[in-house]
Amino acid sequence: YDLLHPEVNWRELQREFITQTCRGNDYSTYSRPNRRYMSAGRYFPSGVSESVDELIIAIDTSGSIGQQELTKFLSEIQGAVEVTSPSSIRVLYWDTEVCRDEVYGEQGQPVDQLVHSTKPAGGGGTWVGCVNKYIQEKQIQAQATIVFTDGYLGGDWGTWSNPLLWCILDNKSAKPTTGTAIHINL
């Protein structure tokens, strides 16, 4: 794909949404003393950082989404991948069902290969509820979901079990009833 420059300032969005909902836990513990001070006979706690778990990126591939829209979505995803550091990213392509599930990171391909190795699937109607249904059925434990769509969902924004960010393409009238929404232009 010939990617475009991402419109969304993902660094800013990361501060607002992703780090609030997806941040790992940083804490200190004496169970692993800081070795720098042990030679001086002092015991201080060492810092422990837990990484962000799985992030789901759900991409609308219904009939209203063409190659131009997919390229824009992938450009924005590349921007998000460059500034986040989840342990894994799960990409779900959906129309009325989840048509493809790709895992990048710990269990799959390297995250930095996502945009170049992904294979979009779908092209039917639109039912966003299939994404959360799939997440529940597969018992996917993600810290957040980012949904890329044109927002033509027939008024059904679904119910979600984890923090949600909508990236809505060229549809300022789309007003999700759940989660946080940002509008992007083609």
Feature-to-residue mapping (PLM):
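Acidic, polar low-complexity linker/tail segments
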Residues: 1-56, 65-68
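A conditional alpha-helix N-cap/helix-loop micro-motif detector
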Residues: 7, 70, 124-128
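Composition- and surface-driven signal marking solvent-exposed, interaction-prone regions
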Residues: 15, 70-72, 158-162
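Short, solvent-exposed polar/charged micro-motifs at secondary-structure junctions
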Residues: 37-40, 100-103, 156, 176
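Von Willebrand factor
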Residues: 50-108, 130-149, 153, 166-169
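Acidic, Ser/Thr-rich peripheral helices and adjacent loops at domain boundaries
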Residues: 101-128, 182-186
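VWA/integrin I-like adhesion module and closely mimicked acidic/polar interface patches used
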Residues: 152-186
